[in-house]
Structure formats: C-alpha cells, structure tokens
Regions:
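Low-complexity, Ser/Thr/Pro/Gly-enriched N-terminal "stalk/linker" regions
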Residues: 1-32, 53-54, 58, 66-72
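Hydrophobic alpha-helical hairpins/lids featuring a short glycine-rich hinge
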Residues: 136-137
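Generic anion/oxyanion-binding catalytic loop in active/binding sites
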Residues: 29, 41, 99
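Conserved H-X4-D acyltransferase segment
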Residues: 33-47
Length: 148
C-alpha cells in the first residue's frame, strides 16, 4: 500500500515539474511558492535529489537585495492568476530582483528542509549546503532586522 502512495506522490511531482521548479497545483497555483517549494523539496529528496536542489536554486532567484525572499516567484506568464506581478509592482523597490515576485513572504521553512536534505545525503550534499546557506542566512537576517 505504501508503494502506491509513493507512486502517486511521484506522479504529482513529475506532472507539476516546470523546467527547474515544481508548481504546487496545476491551474490554481501556476507559479513557484516559497514554502511550498520547501515541502516539495522534501518530496523530491526521496526521488531525485537534483530536483530537490533545483527547487532551492530556482526559488532563490527571487531573493531581494535586502535578503527578503518573497512568497511567489512569477517564472512564467498567466492571464488568469490574480494578483499577478503587475499588481505587486515590486520593481519600485530598490531591493527587488530582476525576477518578477510578490511583495510578501511566508514562514521560513527552507532551513529545516536543508537540514533534512543534508541528514539524508550527508557529505555528498556539503557543497550544496555551502552554496545555499548564505542566502538562507540573509533571509533570516531580513526577518530579524526588518520584521522583528
């Protein structure tokens, strides 16, 4: 029975894979969401560690200059999703990245997800941890200095 659930979960992840990131739900959520990506990376860690790592890398393309990590990265176009990037108009901020994003964030789950990935893979993931950790640290600094 457990293998049936694993196969179904794998099928959902595969179907929602979008060339570098995974959408949470076809149609309803057509972009990359911050904490969804963390939980999605947990799933990918059981199936394909490279895709788990891709979730992080893709999400961090939306990190702002001040460390802020938004809740949505608009990697693609959608005429039906509201509020889209035009509503957020984050380009007005001097901290905004080139990527189109929202202007709010979500609870920071990526730290414990990174810990899980490392615990699962050990030393083979150390270079990835070294790559990602500074961005996660900057995000937590943002919370401490701007949201505390």
């Amino acid at each position: 029975m457990q293998s049936v659930f694993i196969e179904q979960a794998a099928r959902v992840l595969e179907n929602n894979w979008q060339d570098g990131f995974t959408i949470p739900c076809e149609g309803l959520y057509p972009f990359q969401w911050n904490w969804d990506s963390g939980f999605i990376a947990l799933g990918w860690a059981h199936l394909d560690m490279e895709r788990a790592k891709a979730e992080f890398r893709s999400l961090l393309k939306g990190q702002w200059g001040n460390g802020f990590l938004p809740h949505i990265i608009f990697h693609n176009e959608s005429e039906t999703y509201f509020p889209g990037p035009a509503v957020w108009d984050v380009g007005r901020s001097p901290n905004a990245p080139e990527a189109r994003t929202s202007g709010i964030t979500q609870p920071p789950v990526l730290g414990f997800v990174l810990e899980f990935l490392y615990d699962r893979s050990g030393e083979t993931l150390l270079d990835f941890v070294r790559e990602i950790f500074p961005a996660l640290f900057r995000w937590h600094q943002y919370f401490y200095t701007c949201r505390d």
